[in-house]
């Protein structure tokens, strides 16, 4: 696979900080999009030139999630921070025709997490209200998906600048939040 675009998500930060253990010199990144340059002799699903993107949990195909199926590329095997990568045919899926490589590379983790929360689990309907917290990838995808479904989206952030960005993406009423941690009592 020739990697044309990759994206960073919270999982990649956790790996970089050592909070998800990996082998030394592991190539990071779990989300990418690219073009197939070669296929193995037993590959039947893909052909040279196909435009594909990574899958968040390539080992979880169906059914309830099980711990041993929830491993990521980028922690238990080398990831997409490379120009070329050899991966199993089950670890990728077709890029929708309306997306370019950069757009598709952002979908696998954050985009599908938002979709699962709002659509698969939440059964979101037009006219409902959704709260998104902060400006991370999942929140931004959730905001845009919810607006597409006709929902009102209330967004929160601790930054006025970030709230302006959320408004530009379609957030309705927004709320500025500032966390004040309690101090130790002197009594």
Predicted features and spans:
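Glycine-rich beta-strand-centered segment in the early N-terminal region that forms part
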Residues: 1-6, 16-61, 76-79, 96-98
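Alpha-helix/helix-capping structural signal
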Residues: 6-8, 41, 90, 112
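Cytochrome P450 core scaffold surrounding the K-helix E-X-X-R motif
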Residues: 11-13
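NAD(P)H dinucleotide-binding glycine-rich loop of Rossmann-like/cofactor-binding domains
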Residues: 56-133
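Mid-domain Rossmann-like dinucleotide-binding core that forms the NAD(H)/NADP(H) cofactor-binding site
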Residues: 102-176
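Conserved small/polar residues in nucleotide/adenosyl-binding loops
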Residues: 177-183
